[in-house]
Curated annotation (Swiss-Prot):
One of its GO terms (biological process) is response to external biotic stimulus. The keyword Disulfide bond applies. Residues 1-19 form the signal peptide. GO terms for cellular component: extracellular space; secretory granule. Keywords: Amidation, Cleavage on pair of basic residues, Disulfide bond, Hormone, Signal. Disulfide bonds join 20-25, 41-85, 44-58, 52-75, 59-65, 92-104, 98-116, 105-110. The modification Glycine amide is found at residue 28. This is Oxytocin-neurophysin 1. Neurophysin 1 specifically binds oxytocin. Interacts with oxytocin receptor (Ki=1.5 nM). Interacts with vasopressin V1aR/AVPR1A (Ki=37 nM), V1bR/AVPR1B (Ki=222 nM), and V2R/AVPR2 receptors (Ki=823 nM).
Amino acid sequence: MAGPSLACCLLGLLALTSACYIQNCPLGGKRAVLDLDVRKCLPCGPGGKGRCFGPSICCGDELGCFVGTAEALRCQEENYLPSPCQSGQKPCGSEGRCAAAGICCNPDGCRFDPACDPEATFSQR
């Protein structure tokens, strides 16, 4: 009698765990869910047309980049938000993302990068 009830308890506990069974695995496995939790960084700059790329960096396609200026002050709020954020579409440089035409930014700063220039991309084809 103890054997079947023990087996039922173990099966019940197994069903309640957060294991990734074949039928309910997310695409890319269990750890792929962590990548989906990235939100867009806070808007910043004139008219909120830019996005934060670091604690003192605000960039936008129409604006260019503001580094350490009043336009980038709002970006300091990102330090107090619990979830990670990501700005820019295309990865570039060392852990950076394209911030504006020809500019690649990471949380530490920005630099010119031809990979972020849409006109250069089309002219190379």
